[in-house]
């Protein structure tokens, strides 16, 4: 089943979103042991005193929807954790760095669940769901950073940020340094490499139109990288 069958966060009404949030919070303690499975979802429901009908109402398509909602929840938690006035006072590059970092800080208590989600989405049949989830996160970060581009710049910056999100998340998952200090250094270097507007524009203009998208980072590439790292360990 692909992510095309999953409703996006913008399609959910408040009641369904709240019920999904409640079930997600209940299922998360079980995910490190059971993975993103029906077993973890059902265990969380039992903890909350919910029925199978409640689970079917919230996640009719099962664990895949639960993983997709985890990504949506993380994006909303990221935005809620950032002070809008403080963010507005930063340069655009600093805003992007701050938002990516806050997202990982929000996810830190659930690091093993993130690892399990990456493994789940690395399965080929689930890869489209992972690609769409990362793309949505990139959209939200650029929007929160105040980016209003609607031309080709929008596509290039979005794709480059997807690359930053993927590589930084992989680094973070394997980072054992105190308070993930090495990850924040890695993130700063990645942002410096690919999110300078001048360098982005230069790359886009130097590539013939039909080859632009192929030259940019993609969610699928992130999935392939995760799968190759799993095989290497």
Placement of each model-derived feature along the sequence:
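Acidic/His metal-coordination segments adjacent to aromatic residues that form catalytic metal sites
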Residues: 85-89, 143-148
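Amphipathic alpha-helical packing segments from all-alpha helical-bundle domains
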Residues: 125-147, 155-162, 166
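Short, amphipathic alpha-helix enriched in basic
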Residues: 7-53, 61-68, 72
